[in-house]
């Protein structure tokens, strides 16, 4: 029975193991060895917008295999079929998508071309728009009963990749209220149907027997939202949860190592150098700073070994990057003679001020006089973008919703980039980014991206330090949970609690 209830957010935040047992697993008869077991999932962030897919909550629906998009991305970031089985570019501005036949929404209604038009039109006209549509003008129309045509204002080779964003999920008509509110309850197409949203405390999903694809192995998912990192770790340690997001490094010594799984993230901890003002206007001085950086010390001491040394802007979460990367010519460093620099970062991510301390020591050892500036992000971003610091440490996502790094590179390193902390304006970099942006997704575009990365790194405007990992907790009995760097998949149709295996 459909049940929409709202319960206060504090119910699942207590760290005591007895209370956690009640939070994650309501009292019920003891399970037999052969009984199907529901997956108990502890997530980091509670819903921010009532699980509307037009917000970041869409990624939760995707991670639960509840709401689906027309296409999905493979490990290389290329589009693959989902609710659309094929697509073609008709001309520079039009794309045709053929829809999968026989797809049933969780309320029993049939997915049609009009269903797709309704869902995507809601996203196109939403305020604010989903991130993936920022700066993108497009329209959609049905072509008969089995296809849709998307028309863009300008040529856009990444339309299929854009449509993979969880914020562009296709939902049943019942999800869309006249006032613009989108309610995903019993409205998706995925392997699990969402039946309960209990405010910011929990959610419940059941297996959907009418699913068009592989039927779910597990009978359902019981989701608890647990922002307290120690409470999430305790839930895994005590067997109160089967699957846990974002384990804190500080709790790892208390947890069986078999339950801990590291997932590389498309996020690079980067030192940006101001190329317009101050000591780092000189490329040779930037090269001196790059030569002073000791990445291994940061990985070992700040991240306790649970990060990857950066060889470029793009890390192991984009597995194609390393094999394409070529050695680049190095700028000869100049001698450092007591130049004073201001090194800044923000305190919202707890590890960054510690990174700043180590970098300050390394740069001081190279001859710089280093002043440090640490504030909350909201109070430092404007100054960073205005070029008021010589160096700035940032943990930066390198792919956005399209799964493609060109947008990140343009934003951070193009002359007209909107997030150009390094104040870089290099014609060779702009040329490389423009060329990469015009190429359709695939091997040729990936090669062009690496060439653009090489030109950026040659300027020493950015010194990539390390690539972050997230720690995912899985009980011994938890089988086939997805370890997805893009955080789009977690519980899949294959995910299951193995019979006869302990849950802790």
Annotate each PLM feature.
Residues 112-119, 147-149, 190-191, 218-220, ...:
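Alpha-helical secondary-structure segments
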Residues 208-253:
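Ligand-site clamp/hinge motif
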Residues 42-91, 121, 185-187:
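N-terminal lobe/hinge region of extracytoplasmic solute-binding protein
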Residues 472-504:
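Long beta-strand-rich cores associated with HINT superfamily self-processing modules
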Residues 304-337, 347-354:
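Structural transition elements
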